[in-house]
Regions:
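N-terminal amphipathic, basic helical "cap/leader" segment at the start of enzyme domains
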Residues: 1-87, 97
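Small-aliphatic-rich amphipathic alpha-helix that forms the alpha element of a beta-alpha
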Residues: 19, 42-43, 88, 97-118
Length: 118
């Protein structure tokens, strides 16, 4: 939590004021079942045309891709992420073929849609 009081300029739900980004993790492992449950919930997020342009790549600490994914992060993020039980990378498809379209075109909304999934 922030040491500085957070005060909204206008009336909003307290959950927005009290939100925080964790950067400290325990060494407790996360089970495959729990991790896949989180990813399943994300899979159901809304997207334009119900296209779900995102894909998740994940590695738990005890898996071969752990170091590979950790090394993709910038040094600052690597410093705190190395304590996490799992790393999840989110990628998104940048093109889209509308229903009935013969060719794909840029999916200008892919980052917005992908953001709704995490």
């Amino acid at each position: 939590m922030s040491a500085t009081p957070r005060i909204a300029d206008y009336a909003i739900n307290e959950q927005f004021i009290n939100r925080w980004s964790p950067r400290a993790f325990t060494a407790e492992p996360i089970s495959e079942e729990t991790l896949l449950s989180f990813l399943e919930a994300a899979r159901w997020a809304p997207s334009a045309y119900n296209s779900q342009p995102w894909r998740f790549l994940y590695a738990r600490r005890d898996t071969p891709n752990w170091e590979r994914y950790l090394n993709l992060l910038v040094p600052f993020n690597r410093s705190w992420a190395q304590q996490a039980s799992a790393l999840v990378l989110i990628i998104s498809k940048t093109t889209f073929a509308a229903p009935g379209a013969a060719e794909e075109s840029p999916a200008l909304w892919h980052t917005f849609d992908t953001g709704s999934a995490w």
